[in-house]
């Protein structure tokens, strides 16, 4: 399976990523994060993503920190749009890592070689997961996807966004919810509201559906 992502979006070094998270007011002990980022940098390849475990920072605490330029003249004038979770996903934190996306038992870890999965546009999650695992890759979780957008907002582009199928919700009966989380840009319609046009959003798609503008994000592994 070939893997692609936006060639213009490059992750900064882990120490710079740590400073970005600190600047957002997310970190109780900045020096501890700096030390851990420095340690992880010696054990991971360039282009890796620094992530705080979702037990520390769940998706509901991160989504509103995403930012994208407002569309049109407003964006040219410096106006930005704040991220949000769609109104019919109040259970966003119930979407947890699956057996295909096992997280390290650490508050801070690294995702190696995250890719947006552009080559899987028009694939359903059900079709994409076997191809990912056959290629030795692991699907990104929602929290990992949000971290990626916090570090490199340009990874969410018009007509080139992505699903994070490493996160699923388990129903009380043990079955998996048929929704799968995704990150894309609001069109400002419906319950999103016109004021959110152009904003990065956490939403969901059906497990069996295909979308021409949504890739299936994956990684080489986690450390």
Residue map of PLM features:
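A binding-site-centric feature that preferentially detects glycan-recognition modules on secreted/surface proteins
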Residues: 1-138, 145-223
């Amino acid at each position: 399976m070939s893997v692609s992502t936006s060639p213009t979006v490059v992750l900064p070094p882990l120490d710079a990523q740590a400073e970005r998270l600190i600047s957002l007011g997310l970190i109780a002990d900045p020096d501890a994060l700096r030390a851990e980022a420095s340690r992880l940098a010696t054990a991971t390849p360039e282009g890796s993503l620094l992530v705080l475990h979702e037990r520390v920072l769940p998706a509901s605490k991160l989504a509103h920190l995403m930012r994208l330029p407002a569309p049109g003249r407003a964006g040219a004038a410096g106006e930005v749009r704040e991220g949000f979770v769609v109104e019919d996903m109040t259970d966003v934190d119930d979407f947890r890592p699956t057996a295909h996306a096992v997280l390290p038992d650490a508050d801070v870890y690294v995702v190696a070689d995250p890719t947006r999965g552009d080559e899987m546009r028009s694939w359903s999650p059900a079709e994409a997961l076997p191809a990912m695992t056959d290629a030795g890759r692991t699907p990104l979780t929602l929290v990992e996807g949000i971290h990626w957008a916090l570090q490199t907002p340009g990874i969410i582009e018009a007509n080139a966004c992505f699903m994070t199928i490493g996160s699923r919700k388990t129903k009380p009966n043990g079955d998996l919810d048929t929704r799968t989380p995704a990150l894309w840009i609001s069109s400002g319609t419906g319950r999103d509201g016109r004021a959110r046009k152009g904003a990065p959003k956490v939403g969901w798609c059906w497990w069996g559906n295909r979308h021409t503008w949504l890739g299936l994000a994956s990684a080489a592994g986690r450390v």
